[in-house]
Amino acid sequence: LLEDWEGVICTPDGHINVHETGAVAACGRTVLPTDDADGFLSPEAAERVWQFQTSCGRHMTRPGAIYISNTTESGGVWDLARFDAICDWADGHDLKIFLDGARIASGLTSPAAGGLTLEHIARRCSAFYLGGTKNGMLMGEAMVIADPKLKAAFPYVQKERCGLLAKGRLLGVQFETAFAQPADGGEALYWQLARSANNCALKLRDGMVELGFEPYRHSDSNQQFFTVSAAQQQAFEAVCN
């Protein structure tokens, strides 16, 4: 997605900025975080990064792509309007769009999705992936290269970065099964699992609220976070340890 001199714009809590052990830097690329505080990459914050990074021309890392995730790191769900707004901004700056879809099934089956669909994501993103391990599978994600210009190079990048498995078909079988159309014409297993996970998470949230726990933020996905006191934290740690 990026040339050597380019970087990727993301939120401060974006997975590639926090939880990938410097993997992007190890590949010779730069992460350019915004000042967004809610996990959603906004056009306004992305524009500030763009203006700063392009203010000195060739002397600074130039943005070449944006990174978003659905759901976000804290369980936020992208709806159609918010998604189109950041994609419109990226298109206006000729930037590639990558969506981290580790929890895409949860996001798209959430009541907060607001009309966003997998087909629409495929039309707007340069590349994205379909989460497997966070939706009932043993391992793996399915990378979708939507931009035709990127497809020819991807197999070589996959091999170079040790992403080609000798028995890789075993990963594909999971997705083939998960997306198979049921004989009764119902919803594919991939989406059934996500809806079930969301429903269970919302039941858990309601139960935690009844017990007096305060949600860290509102979330209609299978990610639920709560604020706890120091004493409660110690009690949880004692059980976990």
Task: Describe each PLM feature range.
Residues L1-N241:
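Conserved PLP-enzyme active-site core in the AAT-like
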